[in-house]
Amino acid sequence: MLVAAAAERNKDPILHVLRQYLDPAQRGVRVLEVASGSGQHAAHFARAFPLAEWQPSDVDQRCLDSIAATTQAQGLTNVKAPLHLDVTWGWEHWGGILPQSLDLLLCINMAHVSPLRCTEGLFRAAGHLLKPRALLITYGPYAINGKISPQSNVDFDLMLRCRNPEWGLRDTALLEDLGKASGLLLERMVDMPANNKCLIFRKN
């Protein structure tokens, strides 16, 4: 099983945000997590919302194996087998998920460590797969209207772009535009620890 230190640090702050939008007592809530990584988030959140159906996914086979091992080791029955999913694929190829069937699409720490086309694919799919009034929630470090702060995020962005020119902190203004193109409005921006943010998009 993979263990990501960042996931251990941020899983509770993110859960605090999710609890403001999901009811643990509600049955049948369908959640898709894109780029689930180690599976630590899926396991933590599925335990907190035991009546919801959690669908983890990733493009990396090592992550898929870790997700399966993590959720099985914890005996979680509300987590489905992880999907092999490349976020750049058309939504029709997202594991048979039906249009307007998801209550939440969750994406943690993907946008800044992947090419922009991945974020574009995420928003396109969200426009098709989310139910009306359902949510896309993303988490990570962002530029805000062209400005990156504090200096640690500026340095992080530079490091990412040196590692891969297609990586880097995405601007919330760009994400707002991508959202609007898919019928999603940025409803709220939540300040998180370590200079990260949760962005809450709601489907019209």
Swiss-Prot record:
Protein origin, superkingdom: Eukaryota
Modification Phosphoserine, positions: 149
Keyword tags: Acetylation, Phosphoprotein
Entry-annotated residues carrying N-acetylmethionine: 1
InterPro entries xref list: DUF938, SAM-dependent_MTases_sf
The keyword Phosphoprotein is assigned to this record: yes
PANTHER family: METHYLTRANSFERASE-LIKE 26, UPF0585 PROTEIN CG18661
Protein family membership: Belongs to the UPF0585 family.
Protein name: Methyltransferase-like 26
Lineage: Eukaryota, Metazoa, Chordata, Craniata, Vertebrata
